[in-house]
């Protein structure tokens, strides 16, 4: 029998429907009837006939026609809002619902599984879990570890031993012993009281990453959670039932208590929850709609769910992966700019970089060689200025391997720390099943990921800083030998004038955002937790910096492609022509001024989806795999003994000597 969950004036009502031929209007009237029956204060209605209403789907807020049949208009167990005439939409209906609601009309439940054991999760795995590409299951080894760990907790309860967080209070109340008959209440109270975050909720992708990472850490078997509870949590993840987790409120020690408490609150059926099926709604109704029951916390389990660095680390994981993606593509964008500005490839000579063998520097120089003019990929643009009088390029072109290179090495360093953190037990106390005891420690302290993510923000920012200077060179006719601001009829048209200002503004914001949050600490919990990492802000800040870097490079990409227009009919190299074609598939050339923001967003989306890398990567890898010899075209402005033998041109001597 179909059933619908209907929201009327702050109340959720389960309305069964014995006949699918009934209409949306019937559902609305029946919901209002039940509301009037169950609410003493019914808003002045004496009967259903007094209420005039509209019916909307919670999923996307689509307005329904009252005459449509339920079997056509709605799915079984769907969530519906009845909006009574004269009422504003219930303020507690959906947090930030008008902002897109995070609903996916094309969402498909994943069929593939990823096995978690607490030891092998990668940053790529977690990002894919966040995108909803996999469900989760535990390895048999992980299940055994979890069971053995729980046996230790059960023994503590049975023997009435005084152990922190299990039979005592928390923080300042660590010496307060809790009666045995209140241990479960203790855990629920912990989750409720610590759910004190503020700000916008995490997106479904980020909440999914947070939940998946907490599952992975619990799978290590050092937190004392029961296998039954952990499997319940996994079922919720696999159904994409995601609690409302505000992004602000963690100081990064003792772990990420506030956000993880909000996560746990949804799992116990309280607070708000989101799923692709329901959108935002009360957690208990979302779980019910998916055939799931709220978790009933056993002793220690509330603490097991909320104590750890998973908020910092999951956001840090996204930051690392996005930083890696934009760093790769920054090399391609810069190479295209160098072509437009008629730069030389001499600065990327293998022998130069062998003398300063930083891994990132060598790799960036290699990418430039694989993309720019060579015997393998000749460029008509490069050939057109082969014998110009320019000796060397500006630092923003010539020093890309050195500047971009250290960013690559920074990302690699941070990724190593984040990967270690992904597979670390960060609870307190730790449960050692092999020793049959619990031990209090400080693995919950977020200093490692906090420091790493501050470093990541500082490192990745430099890509935007150098990109903005290249945009200046593209737009400045005295430096580029191109029309001012890359547009015809300058004066009538302003071209990239303010796009460059946008890039400058983003770079300036980043300079403030790069101040390390982890240099700060405030004593909390009555001086019990007297040093904290501020890692949550480090992670959120790093993501903001990375987004700005992506946007600045999107502007440079558009500017470089526009510069190509003024060099036609000359062609650049094959891989860079492919990049140009990709951009032109979503953004047409500027003939005259037009609304520019959508074009910047389109280019940003190409970078965010790694499309620029996808079109250039095959050429880079072919260059690598086939060991194509390095081309070293001769130039009159670079000294070469071989060149002197081939060409008799010399600097004229003064007659006075």
From Swiss-Prot:
GO biological process: L-histidine catabolic process; L-histidine catabolic process to glutamate and formamide; L-histidine catabolic process to glutamate and formate
GO MF, one annotated term: histidine ammonia-lyase activity
InterPro entries reported in the protein's UniProt record: Aromatic_Lyase, Fumarase/histidase_N, HutH, L-Aspartase-like, Phe/His_NH3-lyase_AS
Record location of the 5-imidazolinone (Ala-Gly) cross-link: 253-255
SUPFAM superfamilies: L-aspartase-like (SSF48557)
The reaction(s) this protein catalyses: L-histidine = trans-urocanate + NH4(+)
A GO-annotated cellular component: cytosol
EC category name: lyase
Post-translational modification Phosphothreonine, affected residues: 396, 637
Keyword DNA damage part of the UniProt annotation: no
Alphabetically ordered keywords of this record: Disease variant, Histidine metabolism, Lyase, Phosphoprotein
2,3-didehydroalanine (Ser), modified sites: 254
UniProt modification remark: Contains an active site 4-methylidene-imidazol-5-one (MIO), which is formed autocatalytically by cyclization and dehydration of residues Ala-Ser-Gly.
EC number: 4.3.1.3
Functional pathway: Amino-acid degradation; L-histidine degradation into L-glutamate; N-formimidoyl-L-glutamate from L-histidine: step 1/3
Pfam families in UniProt: Lyase_aromatic
Modified residues (Phosphoserine): 635, 648
Disorder named in the UniProt entry: Histidinemia: Autosomal recessive disease characterized by increased histidine and histamine as well as decreased urocanic acid in body fluids.
UniProt record similarity statement: Belongs to the PAL/histidase family.
Protein name: Histidine ammonia-lyase
Species assigned in the record: Homo sapiens
Gene designation per UniProt: HAL
């Amino acid at each position: 029998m179909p059933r619908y969950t209907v929201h009327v004036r702050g109340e959720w009502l389960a309305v069964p429907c014995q006949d699918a031929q009934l209409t949306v209007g019937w559902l609305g009237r029946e919901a209002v009837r039940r509301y009037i029956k169950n609410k003493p204060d019914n808003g002045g209605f004496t009967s259903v006939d007094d209420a005039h209403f509209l019916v909307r789907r919670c999923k996307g807020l689509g307005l329904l026609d009252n005459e449509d049949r339920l079997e056509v208009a709605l799915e079984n167990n769907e969530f519906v809002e009845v909006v009574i005439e004269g009422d504003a939409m219930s303020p507690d209906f959906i947090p930030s619902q008008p902002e897109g609601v995070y609903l996916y009309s094309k969402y498909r439940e994943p069929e593939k599984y990823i096995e978690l054991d607490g030891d092998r999760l990668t940053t790529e795995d977690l990002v894919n879990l966040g995108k909803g590409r996999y469900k989760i299951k535990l390895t048999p080894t992980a299940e055994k570890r979890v069971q053995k760990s729980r046996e230790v907790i059960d023994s503590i309860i049975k023997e009435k031993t005084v152990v922190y967080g299990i039979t005592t209070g928390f923080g300042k109340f660590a010496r307060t012993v809790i009666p045995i008959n209140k241990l479960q209440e203790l855990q629920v109270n912990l989750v409720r009281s610590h759910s004190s975050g503020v700000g916008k909720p995490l997106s479904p992708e980020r909440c999914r990453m947070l939940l998946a990472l907490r599952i992975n850490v619990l799978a290590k078997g050092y937190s004392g959670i029961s296998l039954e509870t952990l499997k319940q949590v996994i079922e919720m993840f696999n159904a994409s039932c995601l609690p409302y987790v505000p992004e602000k409120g963690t100081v990064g020690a003792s772990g990420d208590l506030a956000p993880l408490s909000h996560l746990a609150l949804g799992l116990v059926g309280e607070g708000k929850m989101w799923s692709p099926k329901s959108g935002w709604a009360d957690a208990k109704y979302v779980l019910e709609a998916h055939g799931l029951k709220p978790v009933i916390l056993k002793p220690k389990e509330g603490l097991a769910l909320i104590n750890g660095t998973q908020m910092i680390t999951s956001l840090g994981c996204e930051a690392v992966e996005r930083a890696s993606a934009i760093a790769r593509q920054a090399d391609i964008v810069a190479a295209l700019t160098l072509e437009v500005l008629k730069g030389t490839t001499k600065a990327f000579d293998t022998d130069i970089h062998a003398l300063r063998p930083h891994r990132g520097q060598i790799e960036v120089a290699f990418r430039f060689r694989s993309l720019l003019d060579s015997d393998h990929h000749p460029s008509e643009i490069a050939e057109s200025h082969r014998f110009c009088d320019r000796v060397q390029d500006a630092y923003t072109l010539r020093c890309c391997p050195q500047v971009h290179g250290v960013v690559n090495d920074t990302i690699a360093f941070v990724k190593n720390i984040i990967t270690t953190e992904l597979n670390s037990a960060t609870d307190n106390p730790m449960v050692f099943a092999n020793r049959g005891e619990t031990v209090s420690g400080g693995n919950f302290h977020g200093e490692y990921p906090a420091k790493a993510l501050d470093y990541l923000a500082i490192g990745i920012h430099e890509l935007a800083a150098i990109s903005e200077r290249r945009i200046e060179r593209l737009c400045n006719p005295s430096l580029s030998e191109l029309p001012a601001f890359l547009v015809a009829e300058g004066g009538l048209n302003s071209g990239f004038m303010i796009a460059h200002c946008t890039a400058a503004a983003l770079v300036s914001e980043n300079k403030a955002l790069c101040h390390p949050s982890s240099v700060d600490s405030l004593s909390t919990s009555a001086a019990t937790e007297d040093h904290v990492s501020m890692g949550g802000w480090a992670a959120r800040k790093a993501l903001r910096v990375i987004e700005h870097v992506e946007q600045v490079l999107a502007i440079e990409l558009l500017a470089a492609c526009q510069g190509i227009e003024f060099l036609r009919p000359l062609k650049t190299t094959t891989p860079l022509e492919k990049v140009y074609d990709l951009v032109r598939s979503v953004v047409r050339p500027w003939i005259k001024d037009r609304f520019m923001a959508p074009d910047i967003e389109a280019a940003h989306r190409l970078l965010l989806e790694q499309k620029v890398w996808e079109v250039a990567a095959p050429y880079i890898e072919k260059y690598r795999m086939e060991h194509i010899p390095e081309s070293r075209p001769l130039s009159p402005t670079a000294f070469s003994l071989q060149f002197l033998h081939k060409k008799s041109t010399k600097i004229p001597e003064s007659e006075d000597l």
